[in-house]
């Protein structure tokens, strides 16, 4: 009995989740969480370290109050709070079982051993031999506009229309950031200069940057128009440089300097043993700097232990709020509470939490390859609501054109299309349709997209998107077609002649072959021509279809 008490006490002591107490919710708590939600996902963007976030949140809250957007976010925040409360109740249930249920205590021990084994398996498979670098352009769109007009460097400036895509570092000091509605940004910073998007120019500049980076890694992997992953392992070997911290940081500094000199754009870099860690590292010292995470288990463990969960790219806002509701604030907290989390979250979500908390990631840079790239999409937010079918369909055509160009550029095809739209009430809807063949052209993509769109009329929307899913490469698609064509005929199980592989035609032919007179005729012919040949054992339909 004493051992059982020790087990419970140590478990509760080590597992902070099991001591959660209900502090009572209030209207002020609801208001606080809603304000944080309205602040958006970009509050962690660099350049806002000295911003009075509480004041900015208050401005956003007051400016949004009474709008349909406010009501929609209020509803989502309420739903999230209820979900968190439900999880807290689950934790209390497990706490009680762990105290009084011996069977559950044994189950807990087994679960702990299973989790430990999973962690050790991940550790054993972790590759610490590759030098992965995440290159992130600093305020990319804004930087290009500043190159065109240097006067903008000293002014608070943002790029976008209706909703901001990015802001320069002067504007960020006021609290202006990406994904912020323009009218709210102007309340925060009345002198804000807003420049319209020029995506064609940004794409050209992105290509210039890629040309520089490709000199160090020919298998460069673009993650977006302004983010790139590199593997510098081969480069250091070719340069006969030892894999020391000094050599690695020196090469990355050289890359950053060359990008700036040749393109005018500054970049920040994260250096680590895998993509997940490199992505986290690139945000540590922005702008125009770099950060190195050690290439050993001890160094990685020390770094991850104190890392706030919000800084991990694999943990979104909703999941972060759920974790905070369970008093989990750092990746170390996740690690120490993996057993209880394995009960609360679905297996896929739990595996993601485990992987993220320990910094387990891939070193394979093939995000644009078909093995990793699952979808290609394009969407647009409109400055005013759209309700005219002709205008909506015109916008859809532009989006489909963009998706088609991206598919062709990457040598991919699709057999499934989806549309997404957000109504004037901020309700998001998605519809998807499978297609009987693989396609990539604008005209082929537009037809099913229009069918999905027209199912939803009448509608008033503020956002529209198109997405191609279930992607495969053109080469693989061609191989599949050739294989199908080669199997387009099959041998008859009776006479062995090749017959068109269509059920009706095949059945008709087999019926003919099985006709008694035909079989007799074939047998007589065989005996007359070769009376000494042994009779071959006849095939049966069962044998044929079972082969």
Swiss-Prot record:
Keywords: Coiled coil, Cytoplasm, DNA damage, DNA repair, DNA replication, DNA synthesis, DNA-binding, DNA-directed DNA polymerase, Magnesium, Meiosis, Metal-binding, Nucleotidyltransferase, Nucleus, Transferase, Zinc, Zinc-finger. It is an enzyme of class 2 (transferase). InterPro entries: DNA/RNA_pol_sf, DNA_pol_Y-fam_lit_finger_sf, DNA_pol_Y-fam_little_finger, DNA_polymerase-Y, DNApol_IV, Rad18_UBZ4, Rev_trsase/Diguanyl_cyclase, UmuC. Signal peptide: none annotated. Residues 20-31 have a biased composition (Acidic residues). It is found in: Cytoplasm; Nucleus. Residues 132-316 form the UmuC domain. Its main location: cytoplasm. Its EC number is 2.7.7.7. Residues 18-39 are annotated as: Disordered. GO terms for cellular component: chromatin; cytosol; nucleus. A zinc finger (UBZ4-type) spans 489-518. DNA polymerase specifically involved in DNA repair. Plays an important role in translesion synthesis, where the normal high-fidelity DNA polymerases cannot proceed and DNA synthesis stalls. Has a role in meiosis. PANTHER family: DNA POLYMERASE KAPPA, DNA REPAIR POLYMERASE UMUC / TRANSFERASE FAMILY MEMBER. Interacts with hus1 and rad17. This is DNA polymerase kappa. It comes from Schizosaccharomyces pombe (strain 972 / ATCC 24843) (Fission yeast).
